[in-house]
Each structure stands twice: as structure tokens, then as C-alpha cells.
Amino acid sequence: MTGSEMMNKALTLLGYTSDFGRTSAEQRFISRAIFVMNSIYADLHYTQKNNGFKALENLEDEILLSERILNDVMPYGVAMLFAESESDGDNLQLFSMLYNQKRLSLTSGDSVKDVMTTPI
């Protein structure tokens, strides 16, 4: 998925669309998109890896994260930062909660191991 596709997905989640359901390609979103995208991209990259982050240089660059993160987590973080930049308090509150819950699910383990200490 490219940065442009991610931006459109986030703007659609926020409801920042035209009467025909098309996302707004207004300059105010495009000019902030790289910063917004790289902020969330770096945050999510480091939940999976300890190094090797390469920031997006333009909106046509591919975002190198797992399919799950691209479809289920990152759009909510990008939407959160766009809402913040628009001073859209209701959407900011909603997408902050959703992003943080979804991000937390990435770092929790898939299974729980019971450990019982025994005297030596």
C-alpha cells in the first residue's frame, strides 16, 4: 500500500469526503501527509523490529508493514493525527482510542505461559 492510498483510507474513515464519497485531495491534507504518515509508520515499525526504519519520501512510496497492520491499525493512527491537525476533537478522541487499542494488540503475546517456581 502506498502513502497516498493510506491517506485516502484515513480521510475516508474520518468522513472527509465529497458528496460522491471521494476523498478530499486538498493541499492542506497533502502538505501534512508525509509527516503524519511517517509518525505513525515509525511507531508501528518499531513494534515489530528494532532497526531498519526507512521513512517515506513521497506519497507514492510503499509502506513496508504487514497486511494486518496496514489494514487494521495504521489507518486509525493516520486518521487520529489528521483529526488533530484539523482540530476535530470528536474524531480525535474516537481515533485515539481505536488506534491505541489496536496498537496494543500488536504487542501483546499470542499465548500465556504459566510458570510455577520451585525450590532448588
Kindly give the residue locations of the regions a language model identified.
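Conserved short "hinge" loops at termini or chain/domain junctions
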Residues: 1-61, 107-120
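Exposed alpha-helical structural elements
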Residues: 5-9, 91-94, 98
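Short, residue-level hotspots on alpha-helical faces of the histone-fold
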Residues: 39, 76-81
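Short, mixed-charge amphipathic alpha-helical segments
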Residues: 59-69
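Elongated alpha-helical scaffolds
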Residues: 68-77
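Short helix-capping/linker segments at secondary-structure and domain boundaries
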Residues: 81-92
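Short, mixed-charge aromatic SLiMs
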Residues: 97-111
